[in-house]
Structures are given as structure tokens and as C-alpha cells.
């Protein structure tokens, strides 16, 4: 009897422990005394319901018609448990379509977590804005900036365009911001008033929004800080991160004054901890949809989102529903070395890249700071998104009739892979577009984007269509460790119907997947023409047993392809954790695109060197002229070099001129020492018997040609750097293409010796 009592006690204790563990998961969520409800009867019906059921009506939620926020008169301000009985009573009312109690959402600002210049402006930090203007004199070196100066030279500086920064507030009286501040684009949803001024504290925690706004709209030529990308645009601030964040607050922020605001810039999202899967709530999702349909007088609001800083945590931005949305332009980062920085995340939804911080020795981003100060240490994808927003403001000034989808097409068609080509993971899709999970379609090129957007030649893209592909007879498929599930998906892309698609934009794979360890899943989707895309990579920190429920994995990697044919979905678990198990419950493939090919895509995309268009003191040179000059490029010592692809007769004719027509050893060594102070000490070249000994021009061009070819690495996928293998960034000794070129030349010198 005594033994039986002891057994019962142990069982009860074990049950209690399990109950506590399950409760602790829910306890993380803090519910607030706010209810959101959709009430088709409008304000009058909402007021009546509030009076009858004991609520205070707080008002309409943002720009969402028939959506209202209520506060219960007798409920506590916060609670660990949801008030299901109150929610049920509200949702059971025949006048209410749905109701939901609001809860706190964890949102992280996407700055990095701690673990002689053009004489155009008198702003003291202009010379440090390397990403806006290239300070180097030599035209042969690759560009480092975003090509904004040629746009400014046309008189396009963001005039008439309104951008609002959704963040922790805006120090609107800052000397470098005040002249461009727009109160109609500003609100404080944390304190519910019209002043977005940030809360000061000892740590300057709330500097984030002011820094992001400064990147966009710092004044030019006012002897303060630096220069904004769109320095004549108007900027506002939405204070919404310095307090409790709910779905209603996010929706109100995303949908704030959409008839006035053109561009919304957001550098935040769910925690970048490598284990969170979260996206917009019901209200925020509706705010996005309302914005693209009704914003900017029907042309659609432009939503710019930072792709995330969870790289060190092994995070994947496909698990972030904000960057993974078809309505946002997701922006990643590149360092001044032209590399993917340590904090950047990889995913198939990233559309493009702008510059930001990299290694600790790299330069960072300059902007305004709290207390009317300046900073040169803004970092992370937080700093990349506002630069992109500023570039889009330049495009909207040039062509105010651009739609939200026009802007995405412009980004896809003009972003450049050449300055980032030394990174692994580049692939050409079925439409001839270069794309990468780290960088999207490449580095933003302001001049190319604005030129293509010219209202005299640009044609708005055709109406958006949506085609849903699913198998109504699909039976759940089991998946275990070291196993895989392959699903063949044939489709005619709604051919013969009004929503037929011939040219793809976004692709969404919506799935419910039950699995014992979510982070061990790997999902790839291969298009009908063979473009393979990683929709989900493994996340070591994600030990959740919750899987995915109706989660949309979004990809832009098949942009421009014809979707007709058989697609292949592959879900695997190669973790080796034999206890893992689960199943694929259901899925559907959602194709977004157009029934006819957009005008600008009727000719293939032509990629040229990013240096083709100069935008600094070297002057602006027409692309066609540069192309014509290529067969007679000058060598480093001023003489002519014959390109490798010249005819054999021309090559033979110059054999006798090699000594005078190719770089000398002395010149190349001098060149290297100019770029690497330690080069001579690390690598002492042998004495040359002849100062006139030169490198054959064939070898010189071989060195150049090798720059864009990824090296092989043992153990990597297919003996090449895989799109999702980070070892490249840990093993490459030369971080910039300049250094790699110089090293290649020095290798040739050593071989000659």
C-alpha cells in the first residue's frame, strides 16, 4: 500500500512537471486588455457592441475599414492567460465577423547585436559615406558605391516623395533632419499621440529610428553630419517599438496615412535567434494588402524591409513572414569588401542588396544620431533597408506613376551581381537572371534603376494574376531522419483561364508540416525549367516540435520564368537524429505573375561590368562608348593591351611589342605595395635579372578571367561553393576583388621568377 502511494505521488509529480513545461511555453505570451474585431456594420455598430458588452471603443485600426479596437472595462491591463470567455462572447455576437484578444509581440531592431572624397558637399561626414561615392581615383578599380551621384546630377533628389520609418521614434528636431520632417507621416503608437519623439535613456536605446531616417533624408550642405540618399525627400517617424507591440499596433503602423506616405521603411522583425517562426498577424496582413491596393491613390504603398541579422545564429529569413511577404522588398547587406557580412541571413525571398557594415575593421554607415549628434557606426541590415528606401524615393520622383510591382520589377531588372560576384551561390535562372540566396538579384544600382523608370519609356507591368496549384487527393506523407519526401507538381499555370500565368514573379509554397524537430528540415523547390531554390535550410537552434502550420515559403528566384511544366518539391532531414519523425500534411503552390510578358522583359537582361557607368570625379561616361573602347584597353603603365579574345593575327602582330605593351614587374610590385602595406614583408620577390621582363598579356587576362570563377573546395557540394555553405567566408584569404587581382598578378610574377 505504501509502495502504491509512492508510485501515485511520483506519477502526479511527473504530470505536474509536464504541465508546467507546457504552461511555460504559453506563459511567454503576455495578453493585453485589447480586443480587435471586424464589424461590417461600421462605427455605429461597434459603438453599440462596446456599450452592450462592457467595452471602451478605442477606434478604428489604422486604415482598415470595419476593424476596431476595444478595451474591456473590468479586465486587467496585462495577463498571462487569454480571456477566452470574453473573446467568445464578443465573437459570438452576430454583428461581429471575428474577434481576437491582442498580445505582446517580441520585435527586434535589426542593428548588429554586440558580441580624399568628392568635394560635393560641405557636410563634415560626407567624406566617410563610401557607399554613396567612391573616393578612389583609379578608374580601373571596381566600384564600391550605389551609383546615386549620377541621379543627383540630373536634379533628382527625392523631391515630393514621403517616406516614413517604422521604428522606436524619430528625433525630428535634429539639425540634419528637421527641414525634411513631415508630421503628417508621423505618429506615436506607443503613447497614442502625434509626436514620435524618442524616449531618452542612459543607453540611447532608442537611437535606431533616428539613424534609419537620417540615412534617407539628412540635409545636404548644412555643415551637419552627412547627406541622405534622397536629401530633398520628406521623412516621418512611427514610434511603435518602444513599448508593447501587438498586431493592432503593427497594422496601424504599416497602414498609417497610406494616401500620403509613399514608402514605409522597416528595420525590425521577429527575433533573429535561429529558432523563431513568425509573421504578420491577421491585422498586419490586412494592412499590407490594403496598402498595395489602396495606398498612393491605388498605385500601392512601397514596403521596404531589412532581411534580418541572424546569420551568426544560423537563422533563415524564410522563417520571417515580414521579409517573406510578396508585398515587401526584402533588402540584405554587403560589406565594403563586396562580401556577405557575418550577420546576414540567407533566404529565397531577398530581392536585392545595399551596403552596410562588415568585419569590425570595415567602415560602417554614417547618419544622424540622438541628441543632435552624428554617427559613423550604424550597422546591420537595419542600415541597408533605409538606403534602399532612399533609392526608391529617387525613382518615385523621376516617375510618380510607378506601381508597387513596377518597383519590384525595376529592382530585379537593374540590380547588379558583378560587384558581389566573388561570393558563392550565384545561379542563372530560366529567364537569364542572376540570383543568390544571400543577395537576391544583386547590389542596387540607383542610376540604372532611375534610368529604366524614365516615364518616357517605362511601361507599367501587366495586371497581377494568381494561380493556385494543389492536389486534392494528396494523402499525408511520412518523413523520418535521413529520409526524404519528393512531390512532383505538374501544372499548366491556369492556362486558358483569366488568371493564366506566363511570366512569373513570386512563388509561394504553402504547407503544413508536422515534425518533431523543426530545425532539421530542408526544403527545396525546383521549377519547371530546372531552377532549384532552397526554401528552407536547417537551423541548428530550432528544436521546436511545432513544425509549420499553413506557412508560406516564398521565393523570387524563378522571376521571369514560364511556370508551365512539372515542378519538384523535396523535403529532407539529413540530421542523423534517428528519433526525428513527422509528416507532410498538406501543401499548395501559389504562382504570382502576369498573363503576358512585361515590356522591359521582352529582350534578355544584359549584364555588364558595374564599372561601366562612372559616377564620381572620373565623370559620367555613356555605356555604349565604354563597350566600344574595350578592345583597346590601356594597361597599367599606359600602353595598349590586346584582349585575350582578339584574333590570332592581331596577337601575332604584337609579339614583338610585349616588353613595351605589358605591365613591368616593377610597376606591378609598386601597385601591390600601394594596396597592401605588408605585401613586401610577407612575400619578398626574388630579384629580377631584367627590369624589362614583363607578363605576357595572355596571362594578365587569365588572371582577370579567374576572378569570377569560384574556387573548388573539398567537401563542398559538387566540389563548388554551395549556396548554403559559409566555409567560403572563413577560408578566403583575400576579401576584396582588388586584392585578389593583385595577388593573381603577383602569383604570375613569382612563376616568371
From Swiss-Prot:
Gene (name only): Pcsk1
Function: Involved in the processing of hormone and other protein precursors at sites comprised of pairs of basic amino acid residues. Substrates include POMC, renin, enkephalin, dynorphin, somatostatin, insulin and AGRP.
Pfam families in alphabetical order: P_proprotein, Peptidase_S8, Proho_convert, S8_pro-domain
Cofactor: Ca(2+)
Record-linked CDD domains: Peptidases_S8_Protein_convertases_Kexins_Furin-like
Domain P/Homo B: 460-597
Molecular function as annotated in GO: serine-type endopeptidase activity
Annotated S-S bridges: 225-374, 317-347, 467-494
Protein name: Neuroendocrine convertase 1
Keyword Transferase appears in the UniProt entry: no
Highest rank taxon of the organism: Eukaryota
Amino acid at each position: 500500500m505504501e509502495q502504491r502511494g509512492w508510485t501515485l505521488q511520483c506519477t502526479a509529480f511527473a504530470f505536474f512537471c509536464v504541465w508546467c513545461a507546457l504552461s511555460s511555453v504559453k506563459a511567454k505570451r503576455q495578453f493585453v486588455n485589447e480586443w480587435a474585431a471586424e464589424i461590417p456594420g461600421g462605427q455605429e455598430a461597434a459603438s453599440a457592441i462596446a456599450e452592450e458588452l462592457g467595452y471602451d471603443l478605442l477606434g478604428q485600426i489604422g486604415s482598415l475599414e470595419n476593424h476596431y479596437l476595444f478595451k474591456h472595462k473590468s479586465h486587467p491591463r496585462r495577463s498571462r492567460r487569454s480571456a477566452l470567455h470574453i473573446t467568445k462572447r464578443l465573437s459570438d455576437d452576430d454583428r461581429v465577423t471575428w474577434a481576437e484578444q491582442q498580445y505582446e509581440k517580441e520585435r527586434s531592431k535589426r542593428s548588429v547585436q554586440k558580441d580624399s572624397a568628392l568635394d560635393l558637399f560641405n557636410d563634415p561626414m560626407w567624406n566617410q559615406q563610401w557607399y554613396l561615392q567612391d573616393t578612389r581615383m583609379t578608374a580601373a578599380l571596381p566600384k564600391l558605391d550605389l551609383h546615386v551621384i549620377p541621379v543627383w546630377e540630373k536634379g533628382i533628389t527625392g523631391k515630393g516623395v514621403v517616406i516614413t520609418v517604422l521604428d522606436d521614434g524619430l528625433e525630428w528636431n535634429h539639425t540634419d533632419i528637421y527641414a525634411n520632417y513631415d508630421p503628417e507621416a508621423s505618429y506615436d503608437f506607443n503613447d497614442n499621440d502625434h509626436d514620435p519623439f524618442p524616449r531618452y535613456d542612459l543607453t540611447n536605446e532608442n537611437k535606431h529610428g533616428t539613424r534609419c531616417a537620417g540615412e534617407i533624408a539628412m540635409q545636404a550642405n548644412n555643415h551637419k553630419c552627412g547627406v541622405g540618399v534622397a536629401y530633398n525627400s520628406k521623412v516621418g517617424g512611427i514610434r511603435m517599438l518602444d513599448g508593447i507591440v501587438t498586431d493592432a499596433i503593427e497594422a496601424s503602423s504599416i497602414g498609417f496615412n497610406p494616401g500620403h506616405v509613399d514608402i514605409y521603411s522597416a528595420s525590425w522583425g521577429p527575433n533573429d535567434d535561429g529558432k523563431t517562426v513568425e509573421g504578420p498577424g491577421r491585422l498586419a496582413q490586412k494592412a499590407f494588402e490594403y496598402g498595395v491596393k489602396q495606398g498612393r491613390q491605388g498605385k500601392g504603398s512601397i514596403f521596404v524591409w531589412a532581411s534580418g541579422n541572424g546569420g551568426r545564429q544560423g537563422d533563415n529569413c524564410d522563417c520571417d513572414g515580414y521579409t517573406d511577404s510578396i508585398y515587401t522588398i526584402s533588402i540584405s547587406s554587403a560589406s565594403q569588401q563586396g562580401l556577405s557580412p557575418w550577420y546576414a541571413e540567407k533566404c529565397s525571398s531577398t530581392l536585392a542588396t545595399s551596403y552596410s557594415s562588415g568585419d569590425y575593421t570595415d567602415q560602417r554607415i554614417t547618419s544622424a544620431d540622438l541628441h543632435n549628434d552624428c554617427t559613423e557606426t550604424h550597422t546591420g541590415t537595419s542600415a541597408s533597408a533605409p538606403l534602399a528606401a532612399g533609392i526608391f524615393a529617387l525613382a518615385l520622383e523621376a516617375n510618380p506613376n510607378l506601381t508597387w510591382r513596377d518597383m519590384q520589377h525595376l529592382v530585379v531588372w537593374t540590380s547588379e551581381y558583378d560587384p558581389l560576384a566573388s561570393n558563392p551561390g550565384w545561379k542563372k535562372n530560366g529567364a537569364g537572371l542572376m540570383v543568390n540566396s544571400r543577395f537576391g538579384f544583386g547590389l542596387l544600382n540607383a542610376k540604372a534603376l532611375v534610368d529604366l523608370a524614365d516615364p518616357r519609356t517605362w511601361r507599367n507591368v501587366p495586371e497581377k494574376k494568381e494561380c493556385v496549384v494543389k492536389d486534392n487527393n494528396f494523402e499525408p506523407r511520412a518523413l523520418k531522419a535521413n529520409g526524404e519526401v519528393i512531390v512532383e507538381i505538374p501544372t499548366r499555370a491556369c492556362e486558358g483561364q483569366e488568371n493564366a500565368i506566363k511570366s512569373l514573379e513570386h512563388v509561394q509554397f504553402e504547407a503544413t508540416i508536422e515534425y518533431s524537430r523543426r530545425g532539421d528540415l530542408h526544403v527545396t523547390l525546383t521549377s519547371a525549367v530546372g531552377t532549384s531554390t532552397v526554401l528552407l535550410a536547417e537551423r541548428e537552434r530550432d528544436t521546436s516540435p511545432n513544425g509549420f502550420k499553413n506557412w508560406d515559403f516564398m521565393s523570387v528566384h524563378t522571376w521571369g520564368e514560364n511556370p508551365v511544366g512539372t515542378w519538384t518539391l523535396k523535403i529532407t532531414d539529413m540530421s542523423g537524429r534517428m528519433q526525428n519523425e513527422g509528416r507532410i500534411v498538406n501543401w499548395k503552390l501559389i504562382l504570382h505573375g502576369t498573363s503576358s510578358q512585361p515590356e522591359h522583359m521582352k529582350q534578355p537582361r544584359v549584364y555588364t561590368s558595374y564599372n561601366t557607368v562612372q559616377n564620381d570625379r572620373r565623370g559620367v561616361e555613356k555605356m555604349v562608348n565604354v563597350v566600344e573602347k574595350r578592345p583597346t584597353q590601356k594597361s597599367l603603365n599606359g600602353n595598349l593591351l590586346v584582349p585575350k579574345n582578339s584574333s590570332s593575327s592581331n596577337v601575332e602582330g604584337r609579339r614583338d611589342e610585349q616588353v613595351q605593351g605589358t605591365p613591368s614587374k616593377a610597376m606591378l610590385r609598386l601597385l601591390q605595395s600601394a594596396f597592401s602595406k605588408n605585401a613586401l614583408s610577407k612575400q619578398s620577390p626574388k630579384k629580377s635579372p631584367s627590369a624589362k621582363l614583363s607578363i605576357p598579356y595572355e596571362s594578365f587576362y587569365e588572371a582577370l578571367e579567374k576572378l569570377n570563377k569560384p574556387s573548388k573546395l573539398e567537401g563542398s557540394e559538387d566540389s563548388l561553393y554551395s549556396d548554403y555553405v559559409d566555409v567560403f567566408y572563413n577560408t578566403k584569404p583575400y576579401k576584396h576583388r582588388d586584392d585578389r587581382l593583385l595577388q593573381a598578378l603577383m602569383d604570375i610574377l613569382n612563376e616568371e621568377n
